[in-house]
Amino acid sequence: MAMMTTTTTTFFHPLLPANTYKSGAVASSFVSVPRSSSLQFRSLVSDSTSICGPSKFTGKNRRVSVTVSAAATTEPLTVLVTGAGGRTGQIVYKKLKERSEQFVARGLVRTKESKEKINGEDEVFIGDIRDTASIAPAVEGIDALVILTSAVPQMKPGFDPSKGGRPEFFFDDGAYPEQVDWIGQKNQIDAAKAAGVKQIVLVGSMGGTNINHPLNSIGNANILVWKRKAEQYLADSGIPYTIIRAGGLQDKDGGIRELLVGKDDELLETETRTIARADVAEVCVQALQLEEAKFKALDLASKPEGTGTPTKDFKALFTQVTTKF
């Protein structure tokens, strides 16, 4: 930083020309600094030669230390939500869009129809998570990834609930849990790692500790087994992560229940095994902002509406979690 070497006897400080001092600030003609910066001037007495020579005020050499402290600016995080066309994914994407000072939201969907459904423009990409190349444009330049993709079973036609029994399910060709919940999620993790993302939030399901869980029998496809494998792959990736294993998802308003965290499916042994999609979405968004959420895996459910105290302190919520997987 260059300083003027002219001294003056008409100004209280021998290093600063009189016409550069205004109410404690330094004019930009003297020192070039950002408008948001602050300057602090400290007078030091020294026996060494000053750039300005002796001061007529003290007879001693004086120098000025200029400290430039630019105002801290935080750039919004660019966050990609995959599965943004799904019921929970839509909510996460919307929440990120609403907090534009903190996030730049991107979405990844499978079809043009899904893109139109969420009013997606240039920030919503169409891709197939089973094909790494097709998701590369969406991942490029992101800071964080929220994975909300999942295989979706279809009910076989002809089921009549009046006759009792249970419905049967199947998965479309190419859309089995192994292909979507394992290979598809692995592709996303690999692509994100290559792009240098700082965090991945993965939404899964409770029940993965029980190989005989009823969800594994749907379509005979072991959906929880493949989900668990993807979660382990993420935990081993070295990328800061938050794994959220949600209870039974409900299409209800969020923000009005006390949220509960657990581990190893212990919440499945209680009466509090469900959670609103909107609450899961909020936990995803909060995880992107809190260091306490990183390198943690948690089961997530809520107390019934009207009991307990609605959760507002998410830092405290994540602090309760001690498990990494």
UniProtKB/Swiss-Prot annotation:
One of its GO terms (molecular function) is copper ion binding. The keyword Amino-acid biosynthesis does not apply. Keywords: Acetylation, Chloroplast, Plastid, Transit peptide. One of its GO terms (cellular component) is apoplast. Its main location: plastid. The modification N-acetylalanine is found at A70. Residues 1-69 form a transit peptide. It comes from the Eukaryota. It is found in: Plastid, Chloroplast. Belongs to the NAD(P)-dependent epimerase/dehydratase family. PANTHER family: NITROGEN METABOLIC REGULATION PROTEIN NMR-RELATED, OS05G0110300 PROTEIN. This is Uncharacterized protein At2g37660, chloroplastic.
